[in-house]
Amino acid sequence: MVNELTILIKNTTVLDLNKFAAVENDILIEGNKISKIGVDIEVNDKENLKIIDGSNKVALPGLINGHTHVAMTLFRGASDDLPLMDWLNNVIWPSESRLTGEDVYWGSLLGIVEMIKSGTTTFCDMYFFMDEVAHAVEQSGIRAILSRGMVALDPENGEKGLKESIDFIEKWQGKANGRITTALAPHAPYTCPPEFLKDVIWEAKRLNVPINIHISETLDEISIIKERYGTTPVRHLESLGLFEVKTIGAHLVHVDDEEIQILKRYQVGAIHNPQSNMKLASGIAPVAKMLEAGVLVGLGTDGAASNNDLDMIEELRAASYLQKVSSMNPEALNAKTSIAMATSLGARALGLTEVGLLKEGYKADIILLNTNETNFYPRHNIFNLIAYSAKGADVDTVIVDGEIIMEKRQLTRLDEEKIKFEANKRGLKLVAG
């Protein structure tokens, strides 16, 4: 049901990401939408009115985590300092083979708590036991694009994954008052043969859902695709017609200028995961070049096992610093652009049209940062302070779909201590074998 409480945020600094301006305003939320932004807003019906004091706070759109595997919080810290393929083959995949639906449920809740407490209001997920992830999303109040990851090197496994994905989409698309949407998620071009990808494309068109896929993450992947198909991952997927469907492409680390133009032409959402790419030594995505070319670039954390946190404020800062040092240009990926990648541009990359901006008529997905901490003084430039000084712990209040799901750092729907206990118990057992 739509939240019936009217919320009025008074006297706050509102970030306008269309004009890249910060204005002192009130925000009125009615139902699940922002109904008015302005000065000295008055509400006649005060019976169902909640007033939030926005002084010493800045309101910005909820952060959007464009790529993660949220239940992988269960494997955080279990194995680090390994190359991607060693890490997957020797640690992660063996541990994941022991996963149960209940494990994924508690691991997802742990990740969702972490995301809410650091200001994320929407995430795009690819994993297993997705019914359990959906239940966690439904229970928590967060917004998500959910997809069941599919690996099809074994045709029987691919067929099973596609059937489960279709069943999941038909069951969950648009549920939780529209907070849950879905996608088809072939893992990557090196784990999904062409004929399988063609089946996925056909089903995505039939179901009218996007495709969520890892692309060009490592040099090993590039070598595998070149050896098998004589081309690069982006060109390979284009030749199959995959980009004719709305595509969310995670990583896109190793792409050339021609491939960047392909991404632009098809409006592929390129999700940059800077901390995961650095930690696994996958490489540095040419984000500045992509943005200059007009590619829709969002940000993601990847799973907590390869990051190792889900803090999007850290991620937008890492993205900016990485582009600056790799190009030896301090002007690369400035503060305003990195914030946009985590909000408005990130929403466009995922194909979401009603979130990512504080705008009348948009869904009320809003976070309030407490700017009365020492890291926000002196108040020279709020965009610079958010991009380069803020921390996830500065998030004071989180509103999703017009409902307050965290206020003054306290979750309103979830039992954080129980979630930490259950996730810890299960994570330790999974890795121990």
UniProtKB/Swiss-Prot annotation:
User: What are this entry's molecular-function GO terms?
Assistant: 5'-methylthioadenosine deaminase activity; metal ion binding; S-adenosylhomocysteine deaminase activity
Q: Which residues take part in binding substrate?
A: 96, 148, 187, 217, 302
* Protein EC: 3.5.4.28, 3.5.4.31
Q: Which SUPFAM superfamilies match?
A: Composite domain of metallo-dependent hydrolases, Metallo-dependent hydrolases
Query: What keywords tag this UniProt record?
Result: Hydrolase, Metal-binding, Zinc
State the InterPro entries in the record. Answer: Amidohydro-rel (IPR006680), Deaminase_MtaD/DadD (IPR023512), Metal-dep_hydrolase_composite (IPR011059), Metal_Hydrolase (IPR032466), MTA/SAH_deaminase (IPR050287)
Query: Is Zinc one of the keywords UniProt gives this record?
Result: yes
Which reaction equations make up its catalytic activity?
A: S-adenosyl-L-homocysteine + H2O + H(+) = S-inosyl-L-homocysteine + NH4(+); S-methyl-5'-thioadenosine + H2O + H(+) = S-methyl-5'-thioinosine + NH4(+)
The yes or no answer to whether the keyword Magnesium is present is: no
Q: Which cofactor does it need?
A: Zn(2+)
Q: Which residues bind Zn(2+)?
A: 67, 69, 214, 302
The UniProt note on the cofactor reads as follows:
Binds 1 zinc ion per subunit.
Q: What does this protein do?
A: Catalyzes the deamination of 5-methylthioadenosine and S-adenosyl-L-homocysteine into 5-methylthioinosine and S-inosyl-L-homocysteine, respectively. Is also able to deaminate adenosine.
Regarding protein family, the annotation reads: Belongs to the metallo-dependent hydrolases superfamily. MTA/SAH deaminase family.
Record-given protein name: 5-methylthioadenosine/S-adenosylhomocysteine deaminase
Q: Which gene encodes it?
A: mtaD
